[in-house]
Amino acid sequence: AMMTGNVSQISPLMPVLQSPLLSVHVMTVMCAYALFALQLLLGIYALMIKGNNYSLDKVTALSQFLLYPAVFLLTIGIFLGAVWANVSWGNYWSWDPKETWALITLMVYAVPFHSTSIFMFRKPQCYHLYMICAFLSVVITYFGVNYLLGGMHSYA
């Protein structure tokens, strides 16, 4: 009963946002971000472990394992967003700040895939420190772009 006054203020979604691709695109990207957040927490935990190499190895293995589905989901999410953009606006990519930062985030998280050829990633502590810092790209993509840069992803 208390919310009936607010219901009249809710406006319908813009037609471009009524695509079924929207929910799949957003859900896929959010699942990737959740896995990246889990890697952030694993990284913080790994840096707190003192003198227990067995635990550190297990945490590192879990973080590296989670990297694959996280990057895969982000890639699929970006691809679905590009398809949706083509259907809605007639082009796949417009270098919108959100698109650009999503691509930057993808590249940042793809770097650890080359851990055998990048010396610093051979040390678990360095790997986890990188994963903690990498989450900054997710924060910028999710929050920073909306509040600082605007673009096509600002629907307010």
PLM ranges: what are they?
Residues 18-20, 55-62:
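Membrane-interface segments at loop-to-transmembrane junctions
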Residues 13-23:
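Juxtamembrane membrane-water interface segments that cap and precede transmembrane helices
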Residues 93-95:
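Hydrophobic alpha-helical bundle architecture
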Residues 1-10, 24-49, 59-88, 97-156:
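Hydrophobic cores of alpha-helical transmembrane segments in multi-pass integral membrane proteins
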